[in-house]
Amino acid sequence: MDADEANTRRDELFLLDVRQPDEYGAGHVPGSVHIPMQELGARQAELPTDRTIVCVCRTGSRSGMVTRALAQAGYAAENLDGGLQRWAAAGHDLQDAAGGQGTVI
């Protein structure tokens, strides 16, 4: 899913940020849920079964792997094309851990 579509549909989607805590703290999509990739198995119960999950990382590589795994497990899952780098380049907002303007690291 491209950044513009994800931004437009943000309220109906479950945005899952799979990056490391320091990356998430530096900048994330407001309202996204942070579950680092390595914790996903233990925290799978936190994922919705009634909404499309859009997986997010910096470039789309890690989130692409998570997207494939979730789809194989029966979830409606899509990858954010180009990750947060493309999201930010499209001019969409990012928030840091303190609630200020975020950045992609």
Name each model feature, range by range.
Residues M1-F14, Q20-T52, S61-I105:
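Rhodanese-like catalytic fold shared by cysteine-dependent sulfurtransferases
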Residues V56:
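Short, surface-exposed ligand- or partner-binding patches at beta-edge/loop junctions that are enriched
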